[in-house]
Amino acid sequence: SPENCQGESQPCGCYCDAEGQGWPQDAEENGDIVCGEXTPC
């Protein structure tokens, strides 16, 4: 499963996959702005 990369290099909540791409996190769960798909981490 992807790791949470929030607070590392993105200004919004996202999950970072093994290839370093960010995927949106559930905004309702963490209350953060959601990243766009495939945003580089």
Curated annotation (Swiss-Prot):
The keyword Zinc does not apply. Its main location: secreted. It comes from the Eukaryota. Keywords: Secreted. Expressed by the venom gland. Nigroviriditoxin is a heterodimer of an acidic subunit A and a basic subunit B. Heterodimer A-B: Nigroviriditoxin possesses phospholipase A2 (PLA2) activity. It consists of a non-covalent association of a basic PLA2 subunit B with a non-enzymatic subunit A. This is Phospholipase A2 homolog nigroviriditoxin acidic subunit A. It comes from Bothriechis nigroviridis.
